[in-house]
C-alpha cells in the first residue's frame, strides 16, 4: 500500500516506479544529458539537493552531519548536500576520502565534482582529508557519498576499514544512490558494505536495493526522479524478469517517493 503524508496523517495513493539495472540507469542518464539537455552538473545539483531535502524531512532535529565524499560523482552529490545543509542551518563537516582540496582540478576528478568541492570551500564548509587515525568527532548523522553506483570490483582494504569504523557509530546513516559496498544491480556485497538507515536513489529504482543483501543494507529507500520527463521511461524500459524479485529475496520495506508533481514525500510499504 502507498501513502501520502499530509501533516503526519497517511492517505492512500497509488504510486509506482520502474526498476532498473545499472546499465539501464546509465542509459537514462545519457538521455537526460544528450536528448533532454540537462547537464551533468545540473543533475548532480538536483540529486544533492533532493538528498538534503529528504534528510531534513526524515530527521528534522539533526544539526551536526558528517559527509564522507569520494572523488567521483557520488562525492559531488555529497558536496552539494553539504552546501544545501549549511543553507538550511545545519553544521556540515566534509570528509574527503581518496582526495583532498585542490585549487586546480585533479586529473581523475570530473570538473563538476571539483566545482562543487570548491563551492564548499568558498562557503566556509570544513573540508577534512580523511585518514584512519583522525578523530571523526560526534556527528548526529552520517552521509555515505563514497561510490554510489560507481563501485567496480571489491571494496579496497582501506575503504573496508573506514566502513567498519562508520558502522560503529550509533547515529543514522544516509547513503546516496547505493550504500558503499553493495552492487547496485545484484544486491550482492563487494567484500564489505556499509549498512544504511536509509538510502536515497535518483532517476530510477536500482534493482540491487531491493534484492539479496542490498535489501537489508539499504534500509528505508527514498526515490526522486530529478524532474525527468515521463517519456524517458518509455525509451528505456525497466526490468521485466519477475524472477529477479521473487519471495526468497524480497520482504516488506519502506520506500519513500517524490517526483516532479509532488512537493512532499510519499511512503510505500512494499
From Swiss-Prot:
Q: Name the top EC class.
A: isomerase
Q: Where does (6S)-NADPHX bind?
A: 73-77, 148-154, 177
Q: Does the keyword Nucleotide-binding apply?
A: yes
Q: What EC number(s) does its UniProt record assign?
A: 5.1.99.6
Residue ranges occupied by any YjeF N-terminal domain in the UniProt entry: 25-234
Gene3D superfamilies from the xrefs?
YjeF N-terminal domain (3.40.50.10260)
Catalytic function, reaction form? (6R)-NADHX = (6S)-NADHX; (6R)-NADPHX = (6S)-NADPHX
Specify whether Manganese is a keyword of the entry. no
| Cofactor binding note of this UniProt entry | Binds 1 potassium ion per subunit.
What InterPro entries has UniProt attached to this entry? YjeF_N_dom, YjeF_N_dom_sf
PROSITE patterns the record matches: YJEF_N (PS51385)
For molecular function, the Gene Ontology terms on record are: metal ion binding; NAD(P)HX epimerase activity; nucleotide binding
Query: Where along the chain is K(+) bound?
Result: 74, 144, 180
UniProt KW keywords: Isomerase, Metal-binding, NAD, NADP, Nucleotide-binding, Potassium
Name the cofactor(s) required for activity, per the record.
K(+)
List, alphabetically, the SUPFAM superfamilies matched: YjeF N-terminal domain-like
What the record says about family reads: Belongs to the NnrE/AIBP family.
The UniProt function text for this chain reads: Catalyzes the epimerization of the S- and R-forms of NAD(P)HX, a damaged form of NAD(P)H that is a result of enzymatic or heat-dependent hydration. This is a prerequisite for the S-specific NAD(P)H-hydrate dehydratase to allow the repair of both epimers of NAD(P)HX.
| Protein name per UniProt | NAD(P)H-hydrate epimerase
Amino acid at each position: 500500500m502507498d501513502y501520502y503524508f499530509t501533516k503526519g496523517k497517511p492517505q492512500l495513493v497509488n504510486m509506482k516506479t520502474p526498476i532498473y539495472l545499472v546499465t539501464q540507469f546509465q542509459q537514462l542518464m545519457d538521455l537526460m544529458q544528450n536528448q533532454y539537455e540537462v547537464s551533468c552538473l545540473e543533475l548532480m545539483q538536483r540529486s544533492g539537493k533532493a538528498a538534503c531535502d529528504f534528510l531534513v524531512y526524515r530527521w528534522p532535529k539533526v544539526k551536526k552531519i558528517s559527509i564522507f565524499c569520494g572523488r567521483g560523482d557520488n562525492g559531488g552529490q555529497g558536496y552539494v548536500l553539504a552546501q544545501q545543509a549549511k543553507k538550511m542551518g545545519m553544521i556540515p563537516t566534509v570528509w574527503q576520502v581518496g582526495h583532498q582540496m585542490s585549487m586546480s582540478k585533479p586529473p581523475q576528478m570530473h570538473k563538476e565534482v571539483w566545482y562543487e568541492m570548491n563551492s564548499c570551500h568558498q562557503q566556509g564548509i570544513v573540508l577534512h582529508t580523511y585518514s584512519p587515525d583522525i578523530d571523526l568527532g560526534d556527528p548526529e548523522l552520517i552521509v555515505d557519498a563514497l561510490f554510489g553506483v560507481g563501485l567496480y570490483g571489491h571494496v579496497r582494504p582501506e575503504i573496508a576499514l573506514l566502513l567498519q569504523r562508520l558502522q560503529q557509530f550509533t547515529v543514522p546513516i544516509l547513503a546516496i544512490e547505493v550504500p558503499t559496498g553493495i552492487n547496485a544491480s545484484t544486491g550482492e556485497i563487494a567484500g564489505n558494505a556499509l549498512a544504511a538507515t536509509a538510502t536515497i536513489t535518483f532517476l530510477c529504482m536500482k534493482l540491487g536495493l531491493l534484492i539479496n543483501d542490498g535489501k537489508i543494507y539499504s534500509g528505508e529507500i527514498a526515490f526522486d526522479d530529478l524532474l525527468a520527463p515521463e517519456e524517458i521511461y518509455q525509451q528505456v524500459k525497466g526490468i521485466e524478469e519477475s524472477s529477479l524479485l521473487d519471495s526468497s529475496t524480497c520482504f516488506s520495506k519502506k520506500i519513500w517517493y517524490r517526483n516532479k508533481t509532488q512537493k512532499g514525500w510519499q511512503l510505500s510499504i512494499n
